[in-house]
Amino acid sequence: MKYLLIILFFSTILLSQTKPIQGSVIDEKGEPLFNVNIVSKPSNTGTQSDDKGVFIFEIPIHDQQIILDHIGYEQETLNAILFKNGTRVTLMQKVVELKPLDVTGAGREQFSPFETKNSVIILDTEELAVRGFVDIGDALFSEQSIVMNETMNGQKSISVRASAPEEMIYLYDGIRINTLGDPLLDLSIFSASGFSGIELVKGGHEKALSSSGIINFIPKLTYGSSASFTQQFGTYNYGGFDGFGSIGSSLVSLNGGIGEGQFSQIYIDAEKPEITTSHQRQFGHLGIKNRYNLEFRFMGFKNGKQFQNYRTGNSVSIDMENIIGKMIHSSPIGGEIIFFGLLQNNLGIESTNSYTINKEDLNNGFGFSFEKPIRSAMAKFNGETNYLTSNWDIDSLTFITKRVNSIFTGSFELVQPERNQGIQLKDVKIVLSKHLISDTPDSSFDEIMDTETWDESSSMFTGSIVSIMSQKRIMLYTNLGNVFRLPSLNERFSNHIRSTNQGTIGLIPEYKNQFEMGIKIENENDNEKPYYAINISGFNYHYSNKIKQIQLTGVPIQFPINYGEASLSGFDSNLSFSSKTKWFNFSSSYAYYLFSDPMAFQLQPDKMVRNKITLKIRWFQLDLIQRSESARQITSINSTGTFLDNRLDAIQTYDANLSLKLKFREYKGTISISGKNLNNESQVLNGISLFDQRYNLNLGLSWK
């Protein structure tokens, strides 16, 4: 406490090291421009011009640049040191084809592809919608070097860097949503509709220290009026639609959408599909902001799914509801504070020949985030608490458990202002986190699963060096961490109920020591020059008490055990290139892993490749995708208690998409034809053909 008071005292002194900036923005005709984004670098202090084109804010005295950016106008960069108050800045209009449906405003993206000390990939959901992916899981699997696992009951989950799917953290506008009894988020119930972007982060991060991967869904929140509709048709009874509409102004926005879809799967010895899946989606977003850096967001979605396997008799029904309220206040001199509330309700029925489970999860959560620049430093504090009640009926047994889950994270980062050239230390950061969990089962459940309390601490250190050359930036970064993962309620239930060996009953936290080092290279994104970006990272993870899933043979049932010590080393890379006129684009994603024990990392290939070529010629766009994976292994156990090692063969597939985009005034129409797995090389799991050959027709129409 004494040191905290000292830090706060000096912070108050340092915060006064600012200077006022005042000016105005006009166009070539001398008319004022409002809602122009003005950002001071490197502190990222920002504001917007008002309806008279005037902007007033304070910036740290060490800032060097003031950047003015507005849709449809050339970006202007001014010298912050030489800037004279009262300056009138003229922005020149440019002719560009804008993305009409959504502009991701300041603060919407949670991660920077270059600045974040991780591998960060941002997916364009408008492009994903055009190409007619079945769901978000299908899109991520096609685009990136990640593993998608699909159970016999149609649940789709992904893993990054050979980690367990339970490690993944899913965010909705920066708020974690996989906080229920089962941390696996079924990606088959999400489509690209409703999102303006998707961020994929590989490796541990301050927002999720124990995870090897993060996915952040950026919800659409268009401050303006727009609408869109897409319709899909395809083989194996694939079809669906998504509709979106938005009304609003520069200060208020209300939008929403609905969607439905269905598809089928086939057994390799069958002539027609025997597995069907249908899903429904609804979402709504409300945004209210003023001209003083205050914004309120209210977001909600309700997704449902019905799965039926007519051969086995297995069926699944899911209804997932989420409501999020968020208040964001950004300071004109840098930093921001966020408060949020979360309400979740999840209903699920899973029926097989072996059992029937009715799941009802109700979660109420709240939290905050606070960050403040302190001269050449940044202090951040984050906290969240979730109150979860799980009411599960398993055959004739009823289990009611309450879990209180609290996380508090603090970080302190020293930031060196970037010079125009040369090699320099960019930043160093230390992150400390405290995680508290308390499980309290119903009294009738005590003899099956006891009360448990965990109090664990994690830490991480990050640092980076940057080199700025002519038209190019290079960053070297490293991450060191000692983190943990606590068992979910679903893992604890499954372990107690389904373990076949008395010695494996009871789960303890999984610990992980992690090390990562990487390099990022990118050139200046100039319309007059080709653009490229390279990201290569190597890492090592060492697990203690690793939690591993065991599959029961012939039924869609898994249960976890603590496997013991295991380690993983590897590297992944991402390369992207765009020609000068953007008619040719190439991206490549590659991953290679070394396992101390392959059976400790279920269904994980040791090599993955994704290559994509995009050609844009006038109204036409052609996408060619090649992807390959090495063989995968999984451990199962039969009715006699014997462990069996199973294998999925290596796979290499080719996809293609041809689209036609036409624009007339404020309307845009799209027609695309997609073919997946054109070489018809599929994998087989439990007799079901995975990633089989499919053809889709997609139609889209949008306004503004």
Where are each of the predicted segments found?
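Short acidic/polar hinge/loop motifs at secondary-structure boundaries
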Residues: 55-58, 148, 175-203, 217
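Outer-membrane beta-barrel domain signature, especially the mid-to-C-terminal portions
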Residues: 273-276, 314, 347-350, 440-443, ...
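Outer membrane beta-barrel strand-and-loop segments of large Gram-negative receptors
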Residues: 283-285, 363-369, 407-411, 504-508, ...
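Short, acidic, small-residue-rich periplasmic hinge/interaction motif at the N-terminus
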Residues: 26, 37-41, 69-73, 83-129, ...
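Periplasmic-side early beta-strands and strand-to-turn transitions of outer-membrane beta-barrels
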Residues: 224-225, 244-319
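Extracytoplasmic beta-strand/coil segments of soluble accessory domains associated
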Residues: 137-176, 203
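Structural signature of Gram-negative outer-membrane beta-barrels, strongest in the C-terminal barrel
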Residues: 329, 376-389, 393-541, 619
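A beta-strand signature from Gram-negative outer-membrane beta-barrel systems
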Residues: 88-90, 189-228
